[in-house]
Amino acid sequence: MFETNYLAGGRLDPPFHPTKTEPFIPGFIMDSFSFQTNETTYTLPADMELYAISVSASIYELDDKWSLIVNGQTVCQDIYTKRIPEGMHFMVYKAVAAGSTITFRFHNQGILDKTVWFELHFLR
């Protein structure tokens, strides 16, 4: 027997389905220096839901990796770069309040300085 637990025309519960509807994708560029860890911090201007990140670099070296930290909680830890730009979609929509901080950290393990681009994908 099949039983419906949601009203027709209703919505599914978060965090697996969003509560916000408008896309907002800020882009960032940063320099990353040889054998250093560099980071950029973004403060949210409004309540939003984070659902993905896109990362690209001017040069890819074997041990380069990145991390994403939301309000001190690590969401992505030591993700090694690939030879192409990448996007990572989360399995949930992470609610993040206005004034919260999101830190992108790039660990340049190579001998070359590089430029790193990343975008944070939100709904607001």
Placement of each model-derived feature along the sequence:
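Beta-strand-centric surfaces of beta-sandwich/beta-rich domains
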Residues: 1-124
